[in-house]
């Protein structure tokens, strides 16, 4: 009889726990936009943490600068860096729209007609399955037509105002929340600790501290990597490929942003950068680019992006992934493979931060489990006990 009572009590306990989790999940889903703003603000505050720490050391004749002013300067610095990326990319788009005219397109078509014909002949010769009438440009056009749904443009234009309005609200919300997270770095910890039982509060504080240290270093490293990759690509495109300075800057920073996506991001950025470089060379009203033939110029562009990626793999990524979040390359590779298989390429952007959070939680709350204690030793955490 007693066993039945205990079993019933345990069952009721688990049912209440499941109901509580379902309720919390439902609330999170209802307010997913608000949660997204908060999480983005947390990321911004983590990126801004080193800047804030540096500013706090500044004394003017023994007088400390007010904390709110330091937070405002830090936030403006981060927003300035993000705005710089956007401002540098916009001229590239505007220059392409301005310089590429119908006449230039016809001239570009004549310039690449012979190389494209040779490529089609090569493909038909070595890949007979493609058929005698295969043309690469036609195949690409058909695939693009499948992706682009022309009938959906009317609804897209109709919802543009709503999208802009929502985007504006989102930007304001993130900036507002980020300011308070930067100003009071313990605010997020207090919010989370208020939701956990008293017996878990100390462990939760340590876990949040560890997560904050690791993710701050990671996001700072990723930001440095973006600018490092952009700098190398800019120098290559400007000095070697001889593209204009504005075009080189725009393409370089675009490839730096794409580089955030592990593994396939550099390929996407390099491919798009090569295409944009070719468009600028052969469709621009003003002559740009090294005076070589089509294939040589294409090879130069590819070589620039490959060299940058080589430096990134040898220098930047080991410092960011291995040093900043204290994980081995094998761990990172397996995590990215799993997440990429489940959620696709874009989900790989958040794979490492999520893995870092889960790793710290596992150690702090389940460190007594043998498998976890062996796989995640204590020296892999930054915070001191």
What are these regions (language model features)?
Residues 286, 290-385:
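Hydrophobic alpha-helical transmembrane segments of membrane transport and translocation systems
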Residues 2-14, 142-145, 220, 240-243, ...:
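Short, amphipathic, aromatic/basic-enriched membrane-interface segments that mark the entry/exit
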Residues 41-48, 178, 254-260, 264, ...:
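Hydrophobic transmembrane alpha-helices
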Residues 16-24, 40, 74-82, 153, ...:
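Hydrophobic alpha-helical transmembrane segments of multipass membrane transporters and ion channels
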Residues 5, 9, 80-86, 90, ...:
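Membrane-helix interface and discontinuous TM-entry motifs in multi-pass inner-membrane proteins
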Residues 61-74, 132-137, 201-204, 246-247, ...:
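Membrane-interface starts of transmembrane alpha-helices
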Residues 1-95, 99, 355-385:
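Anchoring transmembrane alpha helix of integral membrane proteins
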Residues 160-276, 280-282, 295:
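Alpha-helical transmembrane segments and their immediate interhelical loop/hinge regions
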């Amino acid at each position: 009889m007693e066993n039945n009572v205990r079993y019933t009590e345990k069952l009721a306990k688990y049912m209440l726990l499941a109901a509580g989790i379902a309720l919390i999940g439902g609330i999170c889903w209802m307010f997913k936009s608000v949660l997204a703003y908060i999480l983005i603000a947390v990321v911004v505050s983590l990126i801004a943490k080193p800047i804030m720490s540096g500013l706090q050391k500044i004394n003017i004749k023994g007088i400390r600068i007010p904390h709110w002013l330091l937070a405002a300067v830090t936030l403006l610095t981060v927003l300035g860096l993000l705005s710089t990326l956007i401002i540098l990319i916009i001229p590239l788009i505007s220059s392409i729209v301005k310089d590429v005219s119908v006449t230039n397109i016809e001239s570009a078509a004549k310039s690449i007609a012979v190389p494209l014909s040779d490529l089609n002949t090569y493909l038909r010769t070595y890949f007979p399955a493609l058929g005698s009438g295969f043309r690469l440009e036609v195949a690409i056009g058909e695939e693009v037509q499948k992706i682009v749904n022309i009938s959906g443009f009317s609804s897209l234009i109709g919802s543009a105002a709503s999208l802009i309005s929502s985007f504006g609200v989102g930007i304001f919300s993130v900036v507002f929340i980020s300011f308070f997270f930067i100003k009071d770095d313990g605010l997020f910890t207090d919010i989370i600790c208020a939701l956990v039982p008293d017996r878990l509060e100390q462990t939760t504080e340590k876990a949040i501290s560890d997560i904050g240290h690791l993710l701050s270093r990671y996001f700072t490293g990723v930001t440095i990597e973006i600018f490092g990759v952009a700098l190398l690509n800019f120098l290559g495109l400007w000095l070697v490929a001889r593209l204009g300075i504005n075009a080189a800057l725009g393409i370089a920073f675009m490839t730096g942003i794409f580089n955030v996506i592990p593994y396939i991001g550099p390929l996407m950025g390099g491919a798009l950068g090569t295409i944009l470089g070719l468009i600028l060379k052969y469709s621009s009203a003003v002559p740009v680019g090294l005076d070589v033939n089509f294939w040589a110029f294409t090879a130069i562009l590819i070589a620039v992006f490959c060299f940058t990626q080589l430096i990134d793999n040898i220098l930047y990524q080991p410092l960011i992934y291995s040093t900043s979040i204290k994980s081995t390359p094998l761990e990172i590779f397996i995590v990215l493979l799993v997440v990429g298989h489940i959620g696709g390429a874009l989900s790989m952007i958040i794979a490492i931060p999520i893995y870092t959070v889960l790793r710290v939680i596992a150690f702090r709350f389940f460190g007594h489990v043998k498998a976890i204690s062996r796989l995640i030793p204590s020296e892999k955490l930054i915070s001191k006990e």
